[in-house]
Amino acid sequence: MFSGIIEEVGTVESYDGETLVVRANQVLDDLEISESIMVAGACLTVTELSETDSTFTVETVPETRNRTNFGALEQGSKVNLERSLRYGDRVGGHIVQGHVDGVGTVRSVVEDGNSRVIVIEAPANIIESVVEKGFITVDGTSLTVVDRNKDSFSIAIIPYTFDHTTLNERPEGSKVNLEADVTAKYVANLIEPYIGKLQK
């Protein structure tokens, strides 16, 4: 479990479609093999650590590759990183599972005062769980939804978040990993069997 507060932006050292090696600094502190780490919004298991190279290694499976933008990763790509929460940790964002629901496309990035408003086009299965002023996870970052349309939603990014995440490298047309708020997904799943009955 994570909170969507990015600790560090790491750099991809190598990725062959299965084994992903990431160079980092801060998140390596007390990180252990077999622990979970969120990479660009996806919860992955650490399989190797290298103190000499300041890298960690994770493995991706077909389900991860099909659900994420990992197909575009290459040496030098930047990725948001967050270690898993421990009991007693402060949850600065919201409850994030690290289970990416799908990939969205940045439709526009517009400066608005000291913020940037980003509009993201998203698949229907994600849009139906997006709530205005609710939470959404974009490439692992916990963000608040400004508004929602039938096929897109917008988020407002403060300067600190823009400067300390990969959102500053996501121009129009970029693909981003999305995870809808888990609470919304559970509620939708619980009431779905009864919707048809209520409509009769």
Feature locations, PLM:
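Conserved loop->alpha-helix
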Residues: 1-200
